[in-house]
């Protein structure tokens, strides 16, 4: 890979996979888009156009760089993009610069530092780890450090984590550049409350699978899902 990270190839498969998801230039845009998405770190307002321009003008090289951005960086990025596209607004030509959008982005990035372990795990974009698996991993291990040092055998003890997924998770955390990116994120202030490991689902619906269909009158689908999972159910 162009990032220099290790590659992995499943037995019997032709395609190889780069393990440098957090730092690989070829995957950078998608990694940042996923990291900032609503169900991940929820950085409101950081859309694809801004992400493309931040990358094009070398403001970000990895997801950790998002937390180094200041108001002036966003304003300079916007000005350079307008000059590139030949679309400088008349108000800007007259010396009037709108800054509220940039203020809101800086505030959204700052607010995203206070998150949960399950959201953070999902935001990392680990291969095959969706929201449900991220939540299961967070509850099973309780701590990111414990999870990062878990063996493939220990990972397969987690509900719904098979050998292939365990190998992907282990390879992701074994890649030094991914670990460096995670360390940089934590140093930037990204944090969450860790908890005691919960090896088995608890609650009156533990061990049951619930399928949500149709429309709900008083809850959003996400709210209903969160409540059911809090009662121990697995929501399909």
Residue ranges and their predicted role:
Residues 11, 65-66, 132, 196:
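Short loop/turn and capping residues at structural boundaries
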Residues 1-44:
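Cys/His-rich short segments
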Residues 25-27, 62, 218-219:
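Flexible loop/turn segments at secondary-structure boundaries
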Residues 44, 48-85, 92-93, 153-157:
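Compact, charge-rich alpha-helical regulatory domains located at protein termini
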Residues 26, 44-48, 57-60, 68, ...:
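Conserved structured core elements
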Residues 35, 77-236:
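DNA strand-break repair and replication-stress modules
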Residues 11-15, 29-33, 48-49, 148-149, ...:
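Short acidic (Asp/Glu) and glycine-rich catalytic loops that position anionic groups and cofactors
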């Amino acid at each position: 890979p162009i990032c220099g990270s290790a590659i992995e190839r499943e037995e019997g498969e032709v395609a190889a996979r780069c393990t440098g998801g957090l730092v690989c230039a070829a995957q950078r845009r998608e990694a940042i888009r996923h990291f900032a998405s609503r169900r991940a770190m929820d950085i409101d307002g950081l859309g694809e156009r801004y992400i493309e321009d931040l990358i094009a003008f070398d403001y970000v090289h990895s997801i950790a760089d998002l937390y180094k951005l200041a108001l002036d960086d966003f304003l300079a990025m916007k000005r350079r993009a307008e000059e590139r596209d030949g679309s400088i607004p008349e108000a800007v030509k007259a010396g009037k610069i709108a800054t509220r959008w940039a203020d809101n982005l800086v505030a959204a990035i700052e607010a995203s530092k206070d998150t949960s372990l399950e959201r953070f795990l999902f935001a990392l974009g680990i291969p095959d780890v969706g929201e449900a698996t991220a939540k299961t991993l967070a509850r099973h291990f309780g701590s990111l450090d414990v999870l990062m040092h878990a063996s493939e055998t220990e990972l397969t003890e987690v509900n719904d984590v098979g050998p292939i997924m365990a190998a992907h998770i282990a390879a992701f955390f074994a890649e030094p550049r991914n670990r460096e990116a995670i360390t940089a994120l934590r140093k930037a202030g990204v944090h969450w409350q860790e908890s005691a490991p919960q090896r088995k689902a608890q609650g009156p619906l533990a061990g049951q699978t619930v399928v949500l269909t149709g429309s709900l009158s008083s809850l959003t689908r996400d709210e209903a899902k969160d409540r059911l999972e809090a009662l121990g159910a697995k929501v399909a």
